[in-house]
């Protein structure tokens, strides 16, 4: 993989990036209380006495949140720590009623793992340092009143997994590939929905620069970036900013910054705190979390087939190209849609599987893009898609007729077989009828017949096109080609 290098006035610079991804755990209730976690609820309608930090209220660990964190750790091949502990991260802010956040600094639930990413067809392993579980904070609302700010505590206490990568990322493209791959795994596992636009997955981006072979530079952290595109843009801008500062004789200050996506730049928020600034100490209200081996085994057995394994199966068993297999398995919903298509064929061979995959990634994806929809909102069902592919495979429809049928399916929602029957779109392989049409075309174009026989082979396509047009696109192309070759060589 070619190194990503930024050129400055004093030479070449390398980017060093580490990502801290905050993923909201899918659970009906919060990490330490029974309050609900539904997105979009009325402000402060999902707040328990624990979330509001009422005196005397003690936290109780939600088993499901722990289970989801363990399953996520297993999915990235990480070490699961049999004993982990909760710590208090002390700071004051209006959206944190307790005055501290319950987190895991010293003994996280998940240890080291890794993620295999693909950038431009080349694979690279990115190390993951840890995953710990912690509480989310509430949300400040500044647009409700001209003179006051309000706080919504619905989000306070919701379980987050903080997934911390090692500083192994070396380009914006690698950062994008890492987040997309991590999001895919979380969705396959079902531990986070990965909706960055809703805030259920967001990234803190740590960026530094250095000359090749030199030690790591001073890093700046860009907080709460909420899209893959913005992560990549923030890294690019911040790296160039740091290079400019250093080359102008300045010094990079360790600080927290925000990314302004409208201006495409980062700006300073505050000086970066270290762990000692938060005065971490073990939470006295929570005992150490001890996980029996049977619990970890149960989590392992509950895991689905993960994207890398599924991709390899598609390549080896279904004969899909690595690219097509990657496109389908990159998204859990797309892979499930494809699997549902294959179920229609009972025991699909490689030819049918390839045809189904190609139709899905070209025809259906193209149509959905035009409609502004995704695979979960497709107007065509997997069964209907499989039926259409099957009609082409058994010769009922030609490729061009299949496209016509597909357009009607998108508009009407009808099954392809019904459309073919009602509109008389069935492909014909009647050699007598096809030969009769071809004879007329050849008779009407004697000059072109002579030119073809004199060596102008490209005219063969002209005769095919004329035949298909004369038969309304319903002639079997293979039969047309066969008869044309016979008559033109006579």
UniProtKB/Swiss-Prot annotation:
Catalysed reactions listed for this entry: L-glutamyl-tRNA(Gln) + L-glutamine + ATP + H2O = L-glutaminyl-tRNA(Gln) + L-glutamate + ADP + phosphate + H(+); L-aspartyl-tRNA(Asn) + L-glutamine + ATP + H2O = L-asparaginyl-tRNA(Asn) + L-glutamate + ADP + phosphate + 2 H(+)
EC number(s) recorded for this UniProt protein: 6.3.5.-
Subunit structure, as described in the record: Heterotrimer of A, B and C subunits.
Keywords recorded for this protein, A-Z: ATP-binding, Ligase, Nucleotide-binding, Protein biosynthesis
Enzyme class, first EC level, given as a word: ligase
GO molecular function terms attached to this record: asparaginyl-tRNA synthase (glutamine-hydrolyzing) activity; ATP binding; glutaminyl-tRNA synthase (glutamine-hydrolyzing) activity
Family according to the record: Belongs to the GatB/GatE family. GatB subfamily.
Presence of the UniProt keyword Nucleotide-binding in the record: yes
Protein role: Allows the formation of correctly charged Asn-tRNA(Asn) or Gln-tRNA(Gln) through the transamidation of misacylated Asp-tRNA(Asn) or Glu-tRNA(Gln) in organisms which lack either or both of asparaginyl-tRNA or glutaminyl-tRNA synthetases. The reaction takes place in the presence of glutamine and ATP through an activated phospho-Asp-tRNA(Asn) or phospho-Glu-tRNA(Gln).
Record flagged with keyword Mitochondrion: no
Protein name, as recorded: Aspartyl/glutamyl-tRNA(Asn/Gln) amidotransferase subunit B
Classification via NCBIfam families: gatB, PRK05477.1-2, PRK05477.1-4, PRK05477.1-5
Annotated gene: gatB
GO BP terms in the entry: glutaminyl-tRNAGln biosynthesis via transamidation; translation
């Amino acid at each position: 993989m070619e190194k990503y290098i930024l050129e400055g006035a004093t030479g070449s610079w390398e980017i060093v990036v580490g990502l801290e991804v905050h993923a909201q755990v899918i659970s009906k209730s919060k990490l330490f209380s029974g309050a609900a976690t539904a997105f979009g609820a009325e402000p402060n309608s999902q707040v328990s006495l624990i979330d509001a930090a009422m005196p005397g209220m003690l936290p109780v660990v939600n088993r499901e949140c722990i289970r989801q964190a363990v399953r996520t750790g297993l999915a990235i091949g990480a070490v699961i720590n049999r004993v982990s502990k909760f710590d208090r991260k002390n700071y004051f802010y209006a959206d944190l009623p307790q005055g501290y956040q319950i987190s895991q600094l010293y003994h996280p639930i998940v240890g080291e793992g890794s993620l295999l990413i693909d950038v431009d067809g080349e694979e690279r392993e990115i190390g993951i340092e840890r995953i710990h579980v912690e509480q989310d904070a509430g949300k400040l609302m500044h647009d409700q009143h001209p003179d006051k700010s309000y706080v919504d505590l619905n989000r306070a206490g919701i379980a987050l997994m903080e997934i911390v990568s090692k500083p192994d990322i070396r380009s914006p493209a690698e950062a994008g590939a890492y987040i997309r791959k991590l999001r895919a795994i979380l969705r396959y596992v079902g531990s986070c929905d990965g909706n960055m636009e809703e805030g259920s997955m967001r990234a803190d981006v740590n960026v530094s620069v250095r000359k090749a072979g030199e030690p790591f530079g001073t890093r700046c952290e860009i907080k709460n970036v909420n899209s893959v595109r913005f992560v990549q843009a923030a890294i690019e801008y911040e790296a160039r900013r740091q290079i400019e500062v250093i080359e102008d004789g300045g010094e990079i200050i360790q600080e927290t910054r925000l990314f302004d996506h409208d201006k495409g730049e980062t700006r300073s928020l505050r000086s970066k705190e270290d762990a000692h600034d938060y005065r971490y100490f073990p939470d006295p209200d929570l005992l150490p979390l001890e996980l029996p081996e049977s619990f970890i085994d149960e989590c392992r057995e509950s895991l689905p087939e993960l994207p890398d394994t599924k991709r390899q199966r598609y390549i080896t068993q279904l004969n899909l190209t690595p690219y097509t297999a990657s496109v389908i398995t990159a998204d859990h919903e797309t892979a499930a849609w494809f699997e549902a298509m294959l179920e229609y064929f009972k025991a699909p061979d490689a030819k049918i599987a390839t045809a189904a995959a190609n139709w899905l990634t070209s025809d259906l994806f193209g149509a959905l893009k035009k409609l502004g929809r995704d695979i979960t909102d497709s107007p065509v069902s997997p069964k209907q898609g499989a039926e259409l592919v099957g009609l082409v495979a058994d010769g009922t429809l030609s490729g061009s007729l299949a496209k016509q049928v597909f357009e009607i399916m998108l508009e009407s929602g009808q099954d392809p077989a019904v459309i073919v029957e009602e509109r008389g779109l069935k492909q014909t392989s009647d050699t007598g009828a096809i030969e009769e049409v071809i004879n007329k075309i050849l008779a009407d174009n004697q000059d072109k017949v002579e030119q073809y026989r004199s060596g102008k082979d490209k005219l063969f396509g002209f005769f095919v096109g004329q035949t298909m047009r004369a038969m309304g696109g319903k002639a079997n192309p293979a039969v047309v080609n066969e008869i044309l070759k016979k008559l033109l060589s006579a």
